[in-house]
Amino acid sequence: MVQQAVIQRSANQRATNQPTEYIGRFAPSPSGDLHFGSLIAALGSYLQARAQGGKWLVRIEDIDPPREVPGAASRILAALEHYGLHWDGPVIYQSQRHEAYRATLNWLEQQGLSYYCTCTRSRIHQLGGFYDGYCRDRHLPASGAAIRLRQTQPVYAFYDKLLGELHAHPALAQEDFIIRRRDGLFAYNLAVVVDDAFQGVTEIVRGADLIEPTVRQIALYQQLQHPVPGYIHLPLALNNQGNKLSKQNHAPPLPNGDPRPILIDALKFLRQPLPEYWQDLDLYLLLRYAVKHWTLVSIPLQGAITPQKTQRHSQSKYGEL
C-alpha cells in the first residue's frame, strides 16, 4: 500500500534522528558566474547556519558537463570568498562523486525500486506533463534507456520553515521520476540527495524555484532510509520583466569591487536589520552583525525586483553573461 508522507514541523517527529550539530550548505552549478539572485541563496544559507552556530558547506554541482562554463567553478568560489562567505571543510565536486551515485543506483535496483524507461519527452508532454508509469513493468534492457525511481512513498506535502506547509500536485508526488538520464548522466535529484546525506546536511536553505523537486527529494531520502533535512525556500530576485534572475536570463555577475554595498542590498532584499552606520564597518563586522540579527520572520514570502543600483553597477562594470 502506498504510504502518504507529510513532513510537518514537529520536534518530536525528528527527535530520534536530529543531529546535535547544524549543517547547512550552498550548492551552485558552474553554468555561469554568481549573480545577485545566487548571492541571496548563498547569503541566506550562510546566515542561517552561522546563526545556529553550525557549519556551512559548499558543493559544486558539476554533473551536467554540457551546461558548464569553463572556469565558472573557480570564479564562484572566488566570489564567495570576496563577499566574506567562507565555508567549512573541503569543497565537494559532484563530478568526483560518480562512484557514490552508481552505488546508490545499484542498491535501488537490488531493492526493486528502479527500472529502465524509454519514454520520450514528447510522449510525456502529450500525457499532460506527468509520466504515467508506462515502462514500470515492461522489464526493458538498459540500452538507450533512462532509469526511473519506482515511487513507493509519494510525498504530498512538506513543511517549509519560512512558507509553512506546502502541497504538491498528486501526479507530481506519485510520479516515477528519472534518477539517471538516457544519456548516462546522473539526475539532479539523485545526486543532491546522495550528497546531502553524505555530508550530513540538516537543513537546506535555497531559492523558491526549487520548491517543486523537494517532494521528490524527500521521497528519495525515505526510500534510501536517510534522515530528511529541514527546508527553507527563500524568495527569488527578479529582473525588471518579473523573471527570475538567472544565468539563462543573462543576469550580470557580481562585481569585484567593495562587496559591502551589494551585501547591504541583499540584506535589504531579505528585510534584515541593518547597522545604522554600515559604511564604518569592515566586511567581517558587517557579516558578524548580520549573523547576530538574522531572523526568518522578516523575510518576505514572495520574490521582488532586484535593486536597480545593483543591476546598473554589475552591468556597467562587467557586462552580462
From Swiss-Prot:
GO BP annotations of the record are:
glutamyl-tRNA aminoacylation; tRNA modification
Q: Which molecular function terms from Gene Ontology are attached?
A: ATP binding; glutamate-tRNA ligase activity; zinc ion binding
Assigned keywords, A-Z: Aminoacyl-tRNA synthetase, ATP-binding, Ligase, Metal-binding, Nucleotide-binding, Zinc
* Cofactor: binding comment: Binds 1 zinc ion per subunit.
The residues that hold Zn(2+) are: C117, C119, Y131, C135
Location of the motif 'HIGH' region = 28-38
Q: Where does L-glutamate bind?
A: R25, F26, A27, P28, S29, E61, Y188, R206
Query: Which cofactor is recorded for it?
Result: Zn(2+)
- A GO CC term? cytosol
Q: Which residues make up the binding site for ATP?
A: K247
Motif 'KMSKS' region residues? 244-248
State whether keyword Acyltransferase applies. no
Q: Which family does it belong to?
A: Belongs to the class-I aminoacyl-tRNA synthetase family. GluQ subfamily.
The protein here is known as Glutamyl-Q tRNA(Asp) synthetase
Origin organism of this chain?
A: Yersinia pestis
Print the organism lineage. Answer: Bacteria, Pseudomonadati, Pseudomonadota, Gammaproteobacteria, Enterobacterales
Name the gene.
gluQ
